[in-house]
């Protein structure tokens, strides 16, 4: 953001963060929160730290103007890691916080090969039970850089073995399917040719029953544990 001077979740072509997470080899479920501050005097290192701390504080306690999305992302107990980055020049600060749910020890990392998507891994926390594998589609648009938040787009398909099926989206039958509290193993065909960014998201149920109060429509106990995005041109 500092390089392009564009304060947005989206890049200038309208692509959201999940594609860049995948490109960098990050396959866990992640959510990004960003903050910006400007100073009319040159910034020192200590001042930059203080302002960054205030940006983080406001994301939790003064987030009404942003619909409390930052607050709920930062406090959601689904996540067990946070990656915090700060970039700045003489009078601008850009803060990027990525919350990560890293609970899979990969045996075979998620990948696309010969038109098929596959993954295999061990769950490191048996409180998380895999539930749904949903595919979303988002269409990149340059004017999205003005949006205050980002999304994965609309659900277009779900992966599930017979005899189950999805009513409102396409149902894809997997070649391999194991979903339990110890091992996840999936392989299924990809059938998407319409231009867009597709995100494969594995949802899980969190059995820990941690009590907290989201201010948004976020569902308590429903956690993403794997996310893989790819671009169809």
Model-derived features with residue positions:
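Short beta-strand elements
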Residues: 206-233
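Short, compositionally biased P/S/T/A/G/V-rich stretches that sit at domain boundaries
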Residues: 89-91, 97-125
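A well-ordered secondary-structure block
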Residues: 14-100, 133-139, 158-203
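Conserved catalytic region of serine esterases and O-acyltransferases that act on ester linkages
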Residues: 119-124, 144, 178-180, 192, ...
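Short, solvent-exposed loop/turn elements at domain surfaces
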Residues: 3-10, 43-44
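A short beta-turn/strand-edge loop motif at beta-sheet boundaries
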Residues: 124-132
